[in-house]
Amino acid sequence: MGYIKFQKDRKFEIVPIGRVAIDFNPIDINRPLSESKTFKKYLGGSPANIAVGLSRLGKKVGFIGKVSKDQFGKFVVDYFDNEGIDTSQIKYAENGESLGLTFTEIASPTESSILMYRNGIADLELDVNEIDEEYIKNTKAIVISGTALAKSPSREAALKALELAKKNDTIVIFDVDYREYNWKNKDEIAIYYSIVGKQSDIVMGSREEFDLMESLIVKEKSTDEESAKRWLGFGNKIVVIKHGKEGSTAYTNDRKSYKIKPFPVKLLKSFGGGDAYASAFIYGILEEWDIMDALEFGSASAAMLVASHSCSEDMPTVKEINEFIKEKKEQYGEMIARG
């Protein structure tokens, strides 16, 4: 069933907005970050990873963001170009802002952490004047990242994109993507998350992220069902609440729910799965698949990523995901993720 009605004949199918960074993942893993000496550089940042993921899946992808005017910024633009992602709306920071840097720790397959450098960064300098209405008018959907709301002027730029999307019948997907950096306090988080969450068509986040978004509008923490009912009531068509290794559930505006579990894999790291999940799930929605099929596709892609060293570099193709699902079902049974 198609819960989302996308406009036809648009140049782009999806345009993420917001954070792009550089990830440094340790080569010498299974030790604390303080002991790692060798790292490999990758493109990073949830919106950027989602863009790469959807491009690998064959979608026509654009991107709205700002990068540093240096070698790292050039690396991002060149990487996107090589992936077939339109870079016409990626701006360069003019006042010396740097690209966000992320150093990851892979202490063990289940113990991973992230150290981010997010001061004076380019992506939060995206300005309202750099949001082009024609670009948003020419895409089926935009993805707004919660990190884009953390600070002005990026905050206002994201809100302008939201308003222009609603004006032009462009679908809005809100990926909550909470990162503690750059926010002043939890009330600020709740205010701006709610503004976008109340106007989006699809909202995706972890249980903890929904708790943050709802902290000013409820007295006590909600159950998943209560949160889903609330955000569907605001007008969302699909609400996805994630619980990590416990799986996730999609709630739809016809009062149905669909639960998916992770596919079994040998973990390498415990981060990166969320972006792969989002890109593959969104792919299924763009293809107007049944919700359960889209969830299964997302869960499979996430499993593949947590078994891989990078996030962006290891984003799978449609063929690779289908082969992975087929292999796991042959090994564990047809309902391995759906049971």
UniProtKB/Swiss-Prot annotation:
Disulfide bonds: none annotated. Catalyzes the phosphorylation of 5-dehydro-2-deoxy-D-gluconate (2-deoxy-5-keto-D-gluconate or DKG) to 6-phospho-5-dehydro-2-deoxy-D-gluconate (DKGP). Belongs to the carbohydrate kinase PfkB family. Transmembrane segments: none annotated. This is 5-dehydro-2-deoxygluconokinase. It catalyses: 5-dehydro-2-deoxy-D-gluconate + ATP = 6-phospho-5-dehydro-2-deoxy-D-gluconate + ADP + H(+). One of its GO terms (molecular function) is ATP binding. Its EC number is 2.7.1.92. GO terms for biological process: inositol catabolic process. Pathway: Polyol metabolism; myo-inositol degradation into acetyl-CoA; acetyl-CoA from myo-inositol: step 5/7. It is an enzyme of class 2 (transferase). It holds the Pfam family PfkB. InterPro entries: Carboh/pur_kinase_PfkB_CS, DKG_kinase_firmi, Myo_inos_IolC, Myo_inos_IolC-like_sf, PfkB_Carbo_kinase, PfkB_dom, Ribokinase-like. The gene is iolC. Keywords: ATP-binding, Kinase, Nucleotide-binding, Transferase.
